[in-house]
């Protein structure tokens, strides 16, 4: 996975490292990265949609997630998670994220998540709503209605 240009991300969120995130090797355990990415996605969707996520009515689920690690995160570093939507298809969209050290800009990892529109009543995939498509478009400032890249 290539390292994207950090300037292409509008959404940034500080990550609070916890002592328990660190393993016996002295760095943040790789499984914790997904917690950081999940928090970044939750805040991103809140900003994109203009409201907090309704946990009683989930309208998207993860179909695939892939993470590439480039450098370890160590306790005491100032880490931020950058998040953006890369593409919107008919029933799915792609979220691109990056963890990096704020002071040096060193990229720690990059994550790509494919999310699918979901109806919790039927438990089936559904098309991405026009409203969500418009919200991504407006937030990301796309000229192409399906995203960039």
Predicted regions and their residues:
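HotDog/MaoC-like acyl-thioester-processing domains
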Residues: 1-13, 69, 73-75, 86-149
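Short structured motifs
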Residues: 63-69, 80-82, 95
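Short, basic/aromatic beta-hairpin or loop at an interaction surface
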Residues: 53-60
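Residue-level recognition of specific faces of alpha-helices
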Residues: 33-36, 61, 114
């Amino acid at each position: 996975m290539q390292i994207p240009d950090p300037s292409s991300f509008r959404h940034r969120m500080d990550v609070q490292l916890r002592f328990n995130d660190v393993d016996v090797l002295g760095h943040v355990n790789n499984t914790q990265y997904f917690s950081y990415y999940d928090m970044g996605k939750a805040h991103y969707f809140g900003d994109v949609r203009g409201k907090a996520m309704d946990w009683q009515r989930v309208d998207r689920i993860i179909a695939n997630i892939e993470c590439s690690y480039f450098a370890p995160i160590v306790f005491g570093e100032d880490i931020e998670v950058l998040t953006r939507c890369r593409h919107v298809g008919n029933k799915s969209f792609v979220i691109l994220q990056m963890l990096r050290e704020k002071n040096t800009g060193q990229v720690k990892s990059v994550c790509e998540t494919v999310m699918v529109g979901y109806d919790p009543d039927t438990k089936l995939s559904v098309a991405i709503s026009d409203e969500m498509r418009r919200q991504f478009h407006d937030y990301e400032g796309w000229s192409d209605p399906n995203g960039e890249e």
